[in-house]
Amino acid sequence: MAIKYIKKGMAVEESAANQEKTRNIVEGILKDVETRGDDAVRELSEKFDKWSPESFRLSDKQIEEIVSSVSEKTLEDIKWAQAQVRRFAQIQKSALRDVEIETIPGVILGHKNVPVNSVGCYVPGGRYPMVASAHMSVLTAKVAGVKKVIACTPPDPKTGVPPAETVAAMHFGGADEIYILGGVQAMAAMAYGSVGMQQVDMIVGPGNQYVAEAKRQLFGRVGIDL
């Protein structure tokens, strides 16, 4: 009886070619945004997400309207989940103690845990709202003491509008600025400082192969998560 394969892994040669293609595409996008700034970000957002609003950043009024469109039950669930994440993050932070000791007269050794000034949190789009990514990036950064947290997420691929549940999770998590912007262009905007964003010190959050490659290439200019 012949073996029927439901799914096969990619051949080594094909995988290498795919990685090279991804690397080149991402490199081109990053260079374009670094060179042309806002214009490049807007063109890329229009190309990949068909999204070109007057401002990529949501105003306080827009956030309020979006959050109000989410069901009360979903909002309660988001707040409940964030309460658990926040509590554990606070316990983790309390375990990171500063240390200082004078080993011999005049010689003081130690270490301090100092939060970075700004973080860019990316929450990917998809078939369903990725609210957990907002809990685990935006919220934990605020617990850590990060002064400015910028959050980015692409528009809903089904409706073409900001994903309400994700925006709500970002907002309740403590995001200082929320942008509806996705993909490599979002990574570049956060790293270089574009469409109203200030350049961040670190970028965190999951994403597809292009987002992951963008973070890899941007490492050094900004810090990234593991």
Show the residue positions of the predicted features.
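Conserved small-residue-rich beta-alpha loop and adjacent elements
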Residues: E102-A168
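Short, solvent-exposed amphipathic alpha-helical segments in soluble enzyme
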Residues: M136-V138, V167-A169, V195, L218-R221
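N-terminal Rossmann-like NAD(P)+-binding subdomain of aldehyde/semialdehyde dehydrogenases
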Residues: M1-N117
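Conserved NAD(P)+-binding/catalytic subdomain of aldehyde/semialdehyde dehydrogenases
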Residues: G174-L226
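Short coil/turn connectors at secondary-structure junctions
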Residues: A95-D98, V114-S118, A144-V149, A164-T166, ...
